Regions:
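Catalytic donor/gating beta->alpha subdomain of glycosyltransferases that bind UDP-sugars
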Residues: 1-8, 34-37, 41-102, 193
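Long helical/loop segments within the catalytic core of UDP-sugar-dependent glycosyltransferases
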Residues: 1-40, 84-85, 91, 157-168, ...
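A broadly conserved detector of short glycine/acidic/proline-rich loop/turn motifs that flank catalytic sites
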Residues: 134, 141, 187, 194, ...
């Protein structure tokens, strides 16, 4: 739900802000071994390794293209708490990779702010009009996304969009602070520009994942 309505549009907005695609996302990335070598090889011990790989490839002078194909993915039977911890991990990944731009996302929750405005203003006419306009724009954006990604089954969930937006704001706030993420049954601490270390019993240790350098890529 959040991936279709928020993540895909945010990736396209990032393309506009950067002037080109300067990142990579997703479980499926395609490139040549020579390009990978020029970018410094695979570096797994980093939060958002897919994003970072695309960033380094762009810095090496190559162009990155978003595929016109959308791969379907299923996170399985997650509990609500598992979904929240996963999205907090994604939020902190974005924060460490995009820096101060992450905090600019505060303006992206107009639907939530309008509902709060209604309560604070006592429901005056101009607040009602502003709220209706904001929600019309939001639903129009969502319907466009549904058509573009060909996901008609999500139409039956449109009623939950207000709840999703409130949840998204909470996750954004949570992701704005802290250096710890939960991934595959363990806590990882993020340091520097995104290097991850395993955290256990109050201590941190290097994540035992080796990078693949240029010499190892044939």
């Amino acid at each position: 739900f959040g991936r279709c309505f928020d993540f895909i549009p945010s990736a396209l907005i990032a393309k506009v802000i950067d002037g080109a695609v300067r990142f990579a996302v997703g479980a499926t990335l395609v490139t040549r071994a020579s390009v990978l070598a020029d970018a410094g090889g695979l570096q797994f011990n980093r939060i958002g390794s897919d994003y970072n790989l695309g960033k380094r490839i762009a810095e090496a002078g190559y162009q990155i293209k978003l595929s016109h194909y959308i791969l379907e993915s299923d996170t399985g039977d997650e509990t609500l708490w598992e979904m929240i911890t996963r999205e907090v991990r994604w939020a902190r990944t974005i924060r460490f990779n995009r820096g101060r731009q992450y905090y600019g996302m505060v303006i992206c929750f107009g639907t939530v702010y309008c509902l709060l405005l209604l309560l604070m203003s006592g429901g005056v006419q101009w607040a009602i009009a502003l709220t209706l306009l904001t929600w019309l724009i939001r639903y129009f954006q969502v319907i466009i996304i549904l058509i573009c990604v060909k996901a008609p089954k999500l139409t039956s969930w449109l009623w939950s969009l207000p709840l999703r937006d409130f949840l998204s704001l909470g996750i954004w706030l949570w992701g704005a602070f802290g250096q710890q993420v939960f991934w595959r049954g363990r806590y990882l601490k993020i340091e520097g520009d995104g290097i991850i270390q395993e955290q256990a019993d109050g201590y941190t240790k290097d994540v035992k994942i080796n990078s693949v350098n240029k010499a190892q890529i044939k």
